[in-house]
A protein has these predicted regions:
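Extreme N-terminal segment that seeds HTH/winged-HTH DNA-binding domains in transcriptional regulators
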Residues: 1-66, 70-73, 77-82, 87, ...
Length: 94
């Protein structure tokens, strides 16, 4: 449970500074992935931390569930996060 709280606080502190530009030529899922990628790079989402759940990403950034899932999948494909079925997605360690 501590992991969820840790990443939730990070999301709340970061969401005040960024948002999704729905008029941009960059697809929303790529914008959201960039936001999460920056949170990982800056340490706001530390190795082992839980990536905010899809429902939380939807609510905070005003995106569709599919958009949030594609953003997390992109980070998984890049090797930045790993998903454990039934547990969620976590920032990869090392």
């Amino acid at each position: 449970m501590a992991r969820v709280r840790e990443s939730t606080f990070a999301l709340v502190s970061y969401v005040d500074r960024v948002s999704i530009d729905h008029d941009s030529a960059v697809p929303p899922y790529r914008q959201l992935a960039a936001i999460l990628r920056e949170m990982i790079a800056s340490g706001e989402l530390a190795p082992g931390a839980t990536v905010p759940p899809i429902k939380r990403l939807r609510a905070e950034y005003g995106v569709a569930e599919t958009t949030a899932r594609k953003a997390v999948a992109l980070l998984r494909d890049e090797g930045l996060v790993e998903t454990v079925n039934g547990w969620g997605s976590f920032v990869r360690k090392g």
